[in-house]
Amino acid sequence: MIIGIGNDIIEIERIEKAISKEGFKNKIYTQKELENIQKRGNRTETYAGIFSAKEAISKAIGTGVREFSLTDLEILNDDLGKPYVVVSEKLDKILRNKKENYQIEISISHSRKYATAMAIIL
């Protein structure tokens, strides 16, 4: 059973401006995400893709970012580069209220100008 589907698209230039501002990175990205971004070349597209994935997941949850913060979602990559989601204890409780054994699947893509992501919560 599908709990929710979310999609997001963002201009990479917008994220480029945002990450240059004091505090933005720590408000949006976890320490593990920031380390992972550094390992992957510190590319603006990576920041944008992760941001877009978090927004897509919040839409799939159905609440937007009202009951949790974007740092309650962590977007990491497996050994093959496939993105996966780790949720905080707080967000886990919210999701378990919807379905005990939920699963979050995401896909992230980008072009030169845009990053996009899709999320499905099963």
From Swiss-Prot:
Query: What catalytic activity does the UniProt entry give for this protein?
Result: apo-[ACP] + CoA = holo-[ACP] + adenosine 3',5'-bisphosphate + H(+)
Return the GO cellular component terms, semicolon-separated. cytoplasm
E.C. numbers = 2.7.8.7
The prosthetic group or cofactor this protein requires is: Mg(2+)
- Alphabetical GO biological process terms: fatty acid biosynthetic process
Location relative to the cell: Cytoplasm
Which key words tag this protein in UniProt? Answer: Cytoplasm, Fatty acid biosynthesis, Fatty acid metabolism, Lipid biosynthesis, Lipid metabolism, Magnesium, Metal-binding, Transferase
Kind of enzyme, top EC level? transferase
Query: Family, per the entry?
Result: Belongs to the P-Pant transferase superfamily. AcpS family.
Q: What is this protein called?
A: Holo-[acyl-carrier-protein] synthase
Please name the source species: Fusobacterium nucleatum subsp. nucleatum (strain ATCC 25586 / DSM 15643 / BCRC 10681 / CIP 101130 / JCM 8532 / KCTC 2640 / LMG 13131 / VPI 4355)
